[in-house]
Amino acid sequence: MVESIAAGQVGDNKHIEMWKIKRLINKLENCKGNGTSMVSLIIPPKEDINKSGKLLVGELSAAQNIKSRITRQSVITAITSTKEKLKLYRQTPTNGLCIYCGVILMEDGKTEKKINFDFEPFRPINQFMYFCGGKFQTEPLTTLLADDDKFGFIIVDGNGALYATLQGNSREILQKITVELPKKHRKGGQSSVRFARLREEKRHNYLRKVAELAGSNFITNDKPNVTGLVLAGNAGFKNELSETDMLDKRLLPIIVSIVDVSYGGENGLNEAITLSADALTNVKFVAEKKLVSTFFEQISLDTGMIVFGVQDTMKALELGAVETILLFEELEITRYVIKNPVKGDTRTLFLNPTQQKDSKYFKDQASGLDMDVIAEDQLAEWLCHNYQNYGAQVEFITDKSQEGYQFVKGFGGIGGFLRYKVDMEDALGDVGDGGDDFDPDTDFI
């Protein structure tokens, strides 16, 4: 049997693409080979694809010398499959190319299954890798899981200001300015008052310039182009900048950290990145907490604009009423489409792991006939591939925050914000999506 798995192309939701890669990595890591029959090939962007083709020709020639006939044949088959996949591409795709081919052992340790797939990652992998062994190599894929939220940094002191961004492990200096502010005047008399006034005026103008450049660097199309903003410095400038009305009001809500650093310029940037690490990590969790808290608030207010539980959520989605789906990233519900072999009618079931082992869900209750399973998908995967067909968005929820944990345990890990009110009792009717013995206390788990 040949299995073809393809990661999604670049979508409008990076978190969905990251979720797909995370699931793919888990699948690959669970694959075990019989000997050295599993090939992993990753080609970075702009790499000459013919170079990899020549490498495979050499590896294929070397495989002919393997003494064990069974091992030799397995390795040759895996490398040949990789070559065939490579032939599908005239040049390396924009984000690089990943190919995994080989024969794996099933859970019984005896049955073999052929794995054979290729895909372009949703963002570049800048690392070449070729490996032929008893398992698939996934380390380069993990770089795709680094959260690519972009954060802005302003390092400001009495000598100048630096504007930069940090995205994953990549930082970029956007702009630097220098300034020469007059020192404090130590002499008394009228001249000291005049110098103090001039000094304060230059300081004010300097802060105005810093604030203006903050807007030009971190606002695009009338909205912030970074997820969060860090202000850093070794004097009072950073605090004044956060408190002044000269800073664009659109930037104020995204200030996530204000830190003291010992240096200005790039050394100050390095220090600010280190000191603000916890704050940057918390941004994602804060966003999740806010989203789920809003969900709970809507429930407590009984607005009728919330749906939860697998059956209600999926029916509302089918009606086009769901605007945003909240989905636990490790949801263990499988979507089945079953067909009556005599009548020809179909039904859709959403079953948890316990229900999947119960044969009653796969029988026609009137006749006792076994139903034909014509589709079987993890519900989370199905949603990730089909949510756009219903005009919805997907937001993944973890169980790492208190709110996320409550959403998973108390509401089944799936729910949504509605576009309009839906009478779920009328909408559901007698649909048996969970079987006639649907139990909300177990079917939501």
Swiss-Prot record:
Its main location: cytoplasm. It is found in: Cytoplasm. It comes from the Eukaryota. GO terms for molecular function: translation release factor activity. GO terms for cellular component: cytoplasm. It holds the Pfam family eRF1_1. Keywords: Cytoplasm, Protein biosynthesis. SMART domains: eRF1_1. Belongs to the eukaryotic release factor 1 family. Heterodimer of two subunits, one of which binds GTP. Directs the termination of nascent peptide synthesis (translation) in response to the termination codon UGA. In Stylonchia UAA and UAG codes for glutamine. This is Eukaryotic peptide chain release factor subunit 1. It comes from Stylonychia lemnae.
